[in-house]
């Protein structure tokens, strides 16, 4: 009698263990399926992001991003700022030594920061633009974000006041205006200002 009870009890324990094991297996399968589904969703999202990034990159390259180019006149300048959300433009004079220094740095940055368009224009050929933007110092750099001129770099005062500044110095100064992004500790954001025109006096070393 006692042996039968013990046997029945053992069988019940075995069945209970089997039920629990089956339930665990079912839950594990659910978790595995859920993880697979999640991974598939993540994979699809990542693929879409990569496709969009590639499409955006191709479009930007077709608009002149990735290289440092000259624009001939006001029309080309405004076309560049319409097609690209972020534009950095050097106003130069032929033969100006400091403009050639900026050229060297912009050649590097244009290849590195494809999301930003780097251009230069002969200040003598865009009188309307230099008047509108109050360009009085050469070299002057206009920073345009979403068709608004948000900042200027006039001369080399903000770059250390010397000719021998690094590309990183220029890069960090541009990052303060949020026209490009750099991976570093932190950059103090520059105070944003929209400058359409106006009369401002600049006491820089190269008045034009």
UniProtKB/Swiss-Prot annotation:
GO terms for biological process: microtubule cytoskeleton organization. Keywords: Cytoplasm, Nucleus. Disruption phenotype: RNAi-mediated knockdown results in 60% embryonic lethality. Surviving 2-cell stage to 64-cell stage embryos display a disorganized arrangement and do not undergo cell divion. Due to short and diorganized microtubule arrangement, one cell stage embryos exhibit nuclear-centrosomal defects, failed cytokinesis, and abnormal pronuclear activity which include failed male pronucleus migration and the presence of multiple pronuclei. Gene3D superfamilies: Glutaredoxin. Disulfide bonds: none annotated. GO terms for cellular component: cytoplasm; nucleus. It holds the Pfam family Thioredoxin. SUPFAM superfamilies: Thioredoxin-like. It is found in: Nucleus; Cytoplasm. Its main location: nucleus. Residues 68-179 form the Thioredoxin domain. Required for normal microtubule organization and function. Regulates tubulin acetylation in ALM and PLM neurons. This is Thioredoxin domain-containing protein 9. The lineage of its organism: Eukaryota, Metazoa, Ecdysozoa, Nematoda, Chromadorea. The gene is txdc-9.
């Amino acid at each position: 009698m006692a042996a039968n009870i013990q046997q029945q009890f053992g069988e019940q324990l075995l069945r209970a263990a089997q039920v629990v094991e089956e339930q665990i297996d079912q839950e594990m399968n659910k978790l595995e399926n859920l993880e697979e589904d999640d991974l598939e969703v993540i994979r699809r999202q990542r693929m879409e992001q990569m496709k969009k990034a590639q499409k955006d990159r191709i479009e930007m390259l077709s608009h002149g991003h990735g290289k440092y180019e000259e624009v001939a006149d006001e029309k080309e300048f405004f076309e560049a700022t319409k097609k690209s959300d972020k534009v950095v433009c050097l106003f130069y004079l032929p033969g100006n030594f400091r403009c050639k220094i900026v050229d060297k740095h912009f050649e590097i940055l244009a290849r590195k920061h494809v999301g930003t368009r780097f251009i230069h224009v002969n200040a003598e050929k865009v009188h309307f633009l230099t008047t509108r933007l109050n360009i009085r110092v050469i070299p002057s750099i206009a920073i345009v974000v979403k068709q608004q001129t948000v900042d200027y770099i006039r001369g080399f005062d903000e770059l250390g006041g010397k000719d021998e500044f690094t590309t990183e110095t220029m890069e960090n100064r541009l990052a303060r205006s949020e026209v490009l992004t750099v991976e570093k500790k932190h950059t103090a954001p520059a105070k944003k200002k929209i400058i359409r025109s106006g009369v401002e006096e600049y006491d820089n070393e190269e008045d034009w």
